[in-house]
């Protein structure tokens, strides 16, 4: 039990630090488009897709899965920030930006998760 908690906590610390750093570096790039939030959600989608395939095909301690998926990806990706940014755009009546942001986050994250799965499959065959 304690090793599981420690695995999640260590992954979460690294994921949160990376999310903070990427947001700090990229969220001010475009005025109406929070690029940092988009990047962490897309990268997190890719990592989780790759990790799901990896853990399904390797016999590893469940602590690795807890570290990567629950801890790291859970802290790296951010649905609440995405939601707040969309609401902010809607309140400013920037409907086109809000729809674009929703589309990029949802479709992009799904696509990146599939790409993560396919990347693992490709790498495991070569």
From Swiss-Prot:
The keyword Membrane applies. It is a multi-pass membrane protein. GO terms for molecular function: fluoride channel activity; metal ion binding. The chain crosses the membrane at residues 4-24, 35-55, 67-87, 97-117. Its main location: membrane. GO terms for biological process: cellular detoxification of fluoride. InterPro entries: FluC. Na(+) binds at residues 74, 77. Na(+) is not transported, but it plays an essential structural role and its presence is essential for fluoride channel function. Keywords: Cell inner membrane, Cell membrane, Ion channel, Ion transport, Membrane, Metal-binding, Sodium, Transmembrane, Transmembrane helix, Transport. NCBIfam families: crcB (TIGR00494), PRK14196.1 (NF010792). This is Fluoride-specific ion channel FluC. The lineage of its organism: Bacteria, Pseudomonadati, Pseudomonadota, Gammaproteobacteria, Moraxellales.
